[in-house]
Amino acid sequence: MAQAQTTTIPPRGFGQTMRPDTWWIQPLLVFIGLSTFIVYSTWAAFQGKNYFFGNYISPFYSPELFGGSPHSWFGPIPGWWPQWLLFSPALLVLWAPGGFRLTCYYYRGAYYKAFWADPPACTVGEPRTSYWGERSFPLIMQNVHRYFLYGALLFILILAYDVWKALWFVDPATGRSSFGIGVGTLVLAINVYLLGGYTIGCHSLRHLIGGFRDQLAKSPGCYRAYACVSCLNRRHMLWAWVSLFWVGFTDLYVRLCAMGIWHDFRIV
């Protein structure tokens, strides 16, 4: 009986591939994009100033639990806060949306490739030869993404309330509020729309409302909700990047208006 011949494929070294395309461009762009956002958002979070302008507040600082602006929920910096410890309202809340993005299924695949080269791209050799997956610490902690989802949904409601407040402008002469729309109002509203599209299209939410394990819900309402989330989920990468850019731009817009560099034009 003839025996089949077997061929052993030697493991690829780091960066080795037979791909003829410029596969390295995408992970490079991801590295640049995420690095830029991380540096800017970290800098902005530690500033602790120029984060509000009239009825506008930066999404990095909302909800402002304690602080010196009119947007503060519970008043100024609490007396029990250590004098030696830097205080910024953003540091009290950014962990929630930051954790949601950090553990996002799409972002995990993106920054594993861009920052850890694990792997750099499909069919491209990676630095290590063994596969560990997300079964050991610290990567097993990525499973908390489903819990960050609840906080992210709550933040969408809070930011939507900020848009509502951005529709009311106070007259400095009389102190009365009147309805209006400024460029900043639109910037904040677009931010909620994009963050909503990214959050509602989340893989965890799709699984949550889809029904039971390995079985779709039979309720027509649940099925329609599942179809809606699935529609957003098909463009989850696009929602992830556009919303990331816009939330950073929203902070920049409010910050530059507060610094007097940009002028907020009233539309209505």
Where are these regions (language model features)?
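Membrane-embedded alpha-helical bundles that constitute the cytochrome b-like, heme-associated redox core
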Residues: 2-268
